[in-house]
């Protein structure tokens, strides 16, 4: 046929600056609203499993550390359900990643896609983020792509790279 899809993009959460990143711990700036994923967990898992079963690549937008964690859980479940499949699933815009999830990317063969422009933000933007997360949490979890380079295909900048230069702000 004329049209063929090879992947599915699923948005699980949005940017922390708007209090829309799905987090393991609350924001530190006094925000008391509840952040929910775009899709309920069970529905997201069903979508991932169905796409995986059909041989489609999943590209899931997971900015917050809870979104990353649940995205990895969904990929792990799909892998157990369809063990013999070749796959190349991605978590995109991975801005916050908890320590316990770092090795899971390698174990599951999941690519953690990041945005180089956001990985090296302007000083004012970092100050804003420090208001949303305490400095220790921000330093520990924010953009692991800057500090966790290692052998393996799991840290390529990709989803937004065509719009973001390697040298943000020409630094």
Task: Please state what every model-predicted region is.
Residues 1-69, 104-117:
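Metal-coordinating catalytic core of metallo-dependent amide/deamination hydrolases
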Residues 10, 96-97:
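Hydrophobic pocket-lining residues within nucleotide cofactor-binding pockets
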């Amino acid at each position: 046929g004329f049209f063929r899809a090879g992947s599915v993009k699923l948005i699980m959460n949005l940017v922390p600056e708007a209090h829309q990143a799905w987090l393991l711990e609350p924001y530190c700036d006094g925000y008391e609203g509840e952040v929910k994923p775009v899709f309920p967990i069970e529905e997201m898992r069903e979508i991932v499993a169905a796409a995986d079963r059909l041989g489609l690549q999943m590209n899931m937008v997971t900015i917050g550390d809870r979104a990353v964690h649940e995205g990895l859980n969904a990929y792990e479940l799909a892998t157990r359900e369809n063990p013999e499949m070749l796959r190349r699933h991605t978590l995109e815009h991975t801005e916050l990643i908890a320590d316990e999830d770092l090795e899971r990317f390698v174990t599951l063969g999941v690519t953690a896609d990041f945005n180089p422009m956001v990985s090296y933000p302007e000083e004012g933007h970092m100050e804003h983020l420090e208001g949303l997360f305490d400095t220790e949490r921000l330093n520990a979890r924010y953009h692991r792509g800057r500090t966790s380079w290692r052998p393996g295909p799991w840290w390529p900048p990709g989803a937004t790279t065509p719009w973001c230069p390697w040298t943000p702000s020409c630094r």
